[in-house]
Amino acid sequence: MNLQIKSFEEYEKVYRYSVENPKEFWAEIAETFYWRRKWYNVLDWNFKEPRIKWFEGARLNITENCLDRHIYNLGDTPAIIWEPNDPNEDYRMLTYKQLLDKVEQFAHVLKNNGVEKGDRVCIYLPMVPELVIAVLACARVGAVHSVVFGGFSAQSIADRINDADCRLVITSDGGFRGTKTIELKNIVDDALVQCKSVERVIVLTRTRTPVSMIKGRDVWWEDEIKKVETQGNPRFPAEEMNAEDMLFILYTSGSTGKPKGVVHTCGGYMVYTGYTFANAFQYQSGEVYFCTADIGWITGHSYIVYGPLSQGATSLMFEGIPTWPDAGRLWDIVDKHKVNIVYTAPTAIRSLMAAGDQYVEGKDLSSITKLGTVGEPINVEAWNWYNEKIGKGKAPIVDTWWQTETGGLLISPIAGVTPTVPGYAMLPLPGIQPILVDENGNEIEGNDVSGNLCIKFPWPGMLRTTYGDHERCRQTYFSAYENLYFTGDGCHRNEAGYYRITGRVDDVLNVSGHRIGTAEVENAINMHSDVVESAVVGYPHPVKGQGIYAFVIASGHHVDENLTRQDINQTVSRIIGAIAKPDKIQFVSGLPKTRSGKIMRRILRKIAEGDTANLGDVTTLLDPAVIEEIKTGAEKLKG
């Protein structure tokens, strides 16, 4: 089966086939990958439990598909191009052969440090090639990687290490991000005070930040590599895995409490990311593909590492941020490396658009043939700017909708093949069966309708469980509507049948394309000694898409609001990370609560949005007077 669809008629045909014969369809896609042993059963599923098994009985190692199988034809082709934070530092390039050598080397390092198949390894590294090497080396030895984004706090790392019982941590002395140096090793040291399971920490040299190395626990990456080199760099045969063995855990925010560890498995995830990458981006061999995400998020896992490498692509990764040294940095990278495909977030597009067109002018972007967006719905203005200024009206925009839990793209245009409309994710990819339902789970049929977006049939890339807590997986995704996977997103299907994602329908915010649970932020704010209670909602933000608005009841009457605001932001940064800091903090004497004590977030959301004319029925509130006070305070904050 050809992984790439070449016309709209073919899309309709393949889509129909994939929905009517899902097992045959996915088996044909899977045949294009390398398996040590084939499956005896393509799919076994039940959304009630939930139980999802793809390619049962099959044996493989994903790294043989991402590296070994390309060596004969593509050994000297660049696999990874790395662009550093500082434009004056040299870039690095690793061919498929070089990447395989380095992955095998580091697989030996992991083994030498006691890592066995099935062990969990926490990775807290900057965006450097060693991050890709560490991820693939874990997969090669059969260990489960849990990558933590370099912007998370010590507390967030400790929670993730303890939840997964990680034996080993891979980190760096520090990381560069714009003008900042982030002291990653020191943050890990703070985290590990709370972690009993960690036996070893491997530390990469990047920033030369002074760090303390704990004897018997901490070792340098470079020293460990030297040991393997003195043994003559032996090969490292990949560990044979079952298709349903765990590949990685990635933590994501939910509407309640602590982040949950989404589990993806070896076989299905490989097939799904490889297929969706090849098809949606219509990747042609020799193209340079640049995804600006961080590997600490699912986009980096699926569309910097596993998807592109499984297809023999050249994947460009960038250590820095789009706005440093100035807002032309991404376009300098495109110009320098003759990038063909750019995949970035609407937040980045909006901030670059706001900086002004002078940063685009004079850059040679003629190599670009395809563009993509990810992380949140894109507004029409940003879509048009991206299309005109970056794609010069010639590069189709693939506006992709998917989630950490889905493993890969679900609803998305296929570049140059299916139509595009600004702000629309358009049509489901083959094998994906979306359905809109009302509050009671009744299907909303026809077009020009809106509802809650669910998926009614499994696909190979979907999550299998939440680590150590299968019941939470069932409750979060499979209990709202019977026999459906509930996405947590609202959706509009227009008269032509195209899908537009309208945003979360639960208590989860999408800030700069990052998912943050309101409960998480509230819990962090409430840790501040001067805070009695808080409620957090989202509001429209010109750059981030959604901003974080916190309503806070402070103890005592004489609060220095500005000082307390700074303190609260520091508290949130310390507990979660800087990405969760509220954009607005409003002090209030009370919160709108029902008689049963439930906070009416709907009302707070409207006030935060500035939509105070129609707050709906407030008669059920315990103290309706508090609403007027909050409205007045919100006006003041705006002014």
Model-derived regions, located:
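Conserved AMP-binding/adenylate-forming core of the ANL superfamily
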Residues: 63, 80-136, 153-158, 213, ...
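Conserved pre-ATP/AMP-binding loop-to-beta segment of ANL
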Residues: 76-78, 202-203, 209, 214-251, ...
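Conserved AMP-binding A3 loop
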Residues: 91-97, 239-240, 247-271
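AMP-binding/adenylate-forming catalytic core of the ANL superfamily
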Residues: 148-174, 188, 335, 342, ...
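AMP-binding/adenylate-forming catalytic domain of the ANL superfamily
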Residues: 200-205, 543, 574-599, 611-637
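Gly/Ser/Thr-rich phosphate-binding loop
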Residues: 222-225, 313, 340-344, 353-422, ...
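Conserved AMP-binding/adenylation subdomain of ANL enzymes
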Residues: 268-288, 298-340, 355
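Conserved ATP/PPi-binding loop(s) of AMP-dependent carboxylate-activating enzymes
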Residues: 427-431, 442-477, 516, 612
